[in-house]
Regions:
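Low-complexity, flexible helical/coil segments
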Residues: 8-9, 33-39, 108-110, 167
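Hydrophobic helix-and-loop "lid/oligomerization" segment in the mid-to-C-terminal part
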Residues: 14, 46-197
Length: 197
């Protein structure tokens, strides 16, 4: 969902094939990268199935249902507006996450203490799953989140989810310390006085 423009504002495309909702007349350009990837996977599955009516074999339907959970997590964690396609994908994905068979999603639900829920809310995804996935990226270790969501090894998924949980706790502590330091600096400089606010 990043604009493809140069410094002057003109459309600037790389010399490689791209899939981007902001070009080619797509009706809604507010989708996040996770939804772009999901839609690309859906189209590839339809082409691979070779059915002109878009019917998919059950194994591809099951896979795409699981991938919709990832698209929903990405939509909510990326904080794109929950309107139009985003709302539909988030709603469907939220209903499906608890049944998702992706080992990394199952492990992430366990470390977030959400594995016993029948249906998650956007708040739970946004404040309990998203931060665990995003924290590693903020601290320069995004590969761990990608591996978590891509691995088929349940033991590896579990250890990665635990590691992401630990990094998220570290990020929370760092944020808390920084807020305390900022508050102390503000107080030391008299910004608690009415005339300095």
């Amino acid at each position: 969902h990043k604009p493809l423009q140069d410094e002057s504002g003109a459309l600037s495309l790389p010399g490689v094939p791209i899939v981007h909702p902001g070009i080619g007349g797509y009706p809604f350009d507010g989708i996040c990268g996770a939804v772009v990837a999901w839609k690309l996977a859906w189209m590839c599955a339809r082409l691979a199935a070779g059915d002109e009516h878009g019917r998919l074999p059950s194994h591809l339907r099951s896979l795409l249902a699981d991938l919709t959970s990832l698209a929903a997590i990405g939509t909510i964690a990326d904080v794109v507006p929950l309107e139009e396609e985003n709302r539909m994908i988030a709603a469907w994905g939220l209903r499906h996450i608890a049944q998702c068979r992706i080992p990394g999603v199952e492990a992430l639900l366990r470390v977030a203490n959400l594995d016993n829920k029948r249906q998650l809310t956007a708040m739970e995804v946004g404040f309990r799953l998203g931060p665990r996935l995003n924290a590693v990226g903020r601290l320069g270790k995004a590969d761990a989140a990608v591996e978590l969501l891509c691995t088929s090894d349940r033991n590896r998924a579990e250890s990665l989810a635990v590691a992401l949980d630990e990094v998220n706790r570290e990020r929370q502590e760092l944020t808390k310390r920084m807020a305390q330091e900022a508050e102390a600096m503000a107080l030391a400089n008299g910004f608690d006085q009415d005339d300095r606010r």
